[in-house]
Amino acid sequence: MGLSRQYLRYVPAALFGLLGSAGGNAAMVALGGERGRGVAVAACEHVFVWDLRKGEKVLILKGLKQEARYLCPSPDGLHLAVGYEDGSIRIFSLLNGEANVTFNGHKAAVTAMQYDQLGGRLVSGSKDTDVIVWDVINESGLYRLKGHKDAVTQVLFLKEKNLLVTSGKDTLVKWWDLDTQHCFKTLVGHRTEVWGMALISEEKRLITGTADSELRVWDISYIQEEVKDPDEPESKKSKGSSPVAEKDTEEDETLELDESPEERLLKCSKVGSIMREGRDRVVTLATDRTGKILACHGTDSVLEVFSILSQEEVQKKLEKKMKKAKKKAKKKSEEEEPEGDVELSLQEEIQRVTNIKASAKIKSFDMILSPKGELKVVLLLQNNIIESYLLNLSAQVPQAVRASKISIGGHRSDVRTLAFSSDNIAILSASAESVKIWNRSTLQCIRTMDCEYALCSFFVPGDRQVIVGTKTGKLQLYDLASGSLMETINAHDGAVWSIALSPDQRGFVTGGADKCVKFWEFELVKDESSVQKRLSMKQVRILQLDEDVLCVRYSPNQKLLAVSLLDCTVKIFYTDTLKFFLSLYGHKLPVLCMDISYDGTLIATGSADRNVKIWGLDFGDCHRSLFAHDDSVMYLQFVAKSHLFFTAGKDGKIKQWDADKFEHIQTLEGHHQEVWCLALSPNGDYVVSASHDKSLRLWERTREPLVLEEEREMQREAEYEESVAKEDQPVVAGETQGETGLAGKKTIETIKAAERIMEAIELYREEMVKLKEHKAICKAAGKEVKG
């Protein structure tokens, strides 16, 4: 029996190029004892804490595999609760970045979280429609509240009462009594999803945001308080209501459930609406910690800021209004007006301050009000930017001023092409708006150059220049020392889909959507602005084809050129004469990527039909077809000096294969969305990949050998554990699903723990039987048994 081939394991080395994931939220945290100086944002599975003043990353809260979805800082500012895509919640210390507590209860992504006033309890809502209350101090789940029919969008503790209010995509707002753990009131006045909620005016009012441009305002009156204080002035009870609002209230009250038995805790009635300027749905609606400022935004780039008057300010305004009304009455020499007619409108109590216009679509925000009356707002934008604004509320006309912007460490759009320099040190990444050069060891961005929509790229031999092919058919040549664009050439009439450097390094070849393959040579031309000559490129030959060209590759000896066409075939031509040599057909959809091995014997093709085919370059025969990914194969590249190759797929996975044994070696999992491209370093030690999740990931080859049988066994175990965790709870005859339940969920750990308990009970029973037998024997022998 021969020795099995030894493979080396690739492991994740770093995540970079990402400032904040648009799928998570932003939360202001304290840095160096200063509140509002730091901002925590979800970054794929990790959480990054940025110093807004310096624009630096100061802390990474490392996650496991699942994407971070929701962040909630504790009231003391020392901890951060992070909810993940799989429903788990981890509580991190902001002092050392360690995860102290893990809660497992939800079956789907966490969508909302909030601490109570003291930070002892945490409530979480999820896409699985459940709400769970957790005991942070005892590190355990208290109970699960069931009632929503769709994802929970917001959860709020009431500070004074032991009550909870939750909203969901099922259009319902539910009130829960946490003493009895049941829902005692359901607001059904909304016709669309309730996307956000906020409690204002010392928890006497509730504001809800839905799919339209109205923010609905509801008055909360606690029944016990009304019984205690029957002499409450009428003006206080009816403040802010208007004839229009009263009509709305009547309409909405008819929609409310008949809950007369449960009206003993509180009443909730609609008093009117605040109109937003945005026409689309509310994405985030929140107040600052003091409850004085309300802000909301939709799916656009505008944050609307409102000021909420306190009880004292409302009273003062009401008195002023009464005085004015009396003066008017005297002037008209009429009888005195009754005071009850004077009341404040809702717009006077909740006043629009200003709008903050961000540079791109807002995905999340957080804000903090300083004692001096200055509002600090931080925005997480869709295009991988974090912006902070300052708003002086004491000014006559408050205007938002941008205080800081964190953007240099990432691209604004998806990276579509990557390349390694010949010395394995520099990494090129290019997107729709810029080309960035990164230092591989420090992961710092050392150059940023504006470009058009980039599709392909490479380092020019010598690593002093780079060439980028664009969607508009241009070739752009950049000088790295100066970071400037040296030359732009209109190369193709359509997109430049592929570019390949010739093995002799004297030129390169491009393939485009204009059905042409063009051959280029490097040349030195005189520069008018300099004495020295500069690098340029000239077209030397052209190969016209019948279909769009998607990918081009040279064989290592430069004798053959492989061209992938839109008709799902790969044509092989002789480079010198451009005569046709072979046609590789068999893919059902176009070949998006391909590569030729270092010895020129094999060509591997990856297609949109999810398959990878390995062909011999001598006769064009297909050695093997491999089902590689669950979606299109986007990129394929051989490891230097070997027949091993990597593929990247739209399913978010990167896989390594053996082209001789036709075996899958390992899967590099980390990206949460489609992987667009990857690049291997010339020495094969590093892999860099780019994804739709805006992250760039670096993978490193270790010296650790990888045994295929062990890998398969580990994969089977992981699949089994996942299937066990997904199994539903057993249905017991005659038992109905209650409104509350246990907070935990079945995982492989809980199953193992239950089995250990069962084993211990079994052992105890066996030992008790033995003890009884021993006692009986001793009794028969007349011996005394101690204990």
Can you annotate each of these PLM segments?
Residues G2-Q6, L15, E193, S213-I293, ...:
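Terminal intrinsically disordered, low-complexity extensions flanking WD-repeat/beta-propeller proteins
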Residues A13, V58-L59, E98-V101, S140-Y143, ...:
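A structural motif specific to WD40 beta-propellers
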Residues A14-E45:
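Beta-strand-rich domains and repeat architectures in extracellular enzymes and scaffolds
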Residues M28-G36, L71-G77, M113-G120, V155-N162, ...:
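Loop/turn segments within WD40 beta-propeller blades
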Residues A42-A43, G83-D86, G125-D128, T166-D170, ...:
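Conserved strand-to-loop turn within each blade of WD40 beta-propeller repeats
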Residues V47-D51, I89-F92, V131-D135, V173-W176, ...:
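WD40-repeat beta-propellers
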Residues K174-S201, A628, S632-K694:
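Ankyrin-repeat and related helical/solenoid repeat scaffolds used for protein-protein interactions
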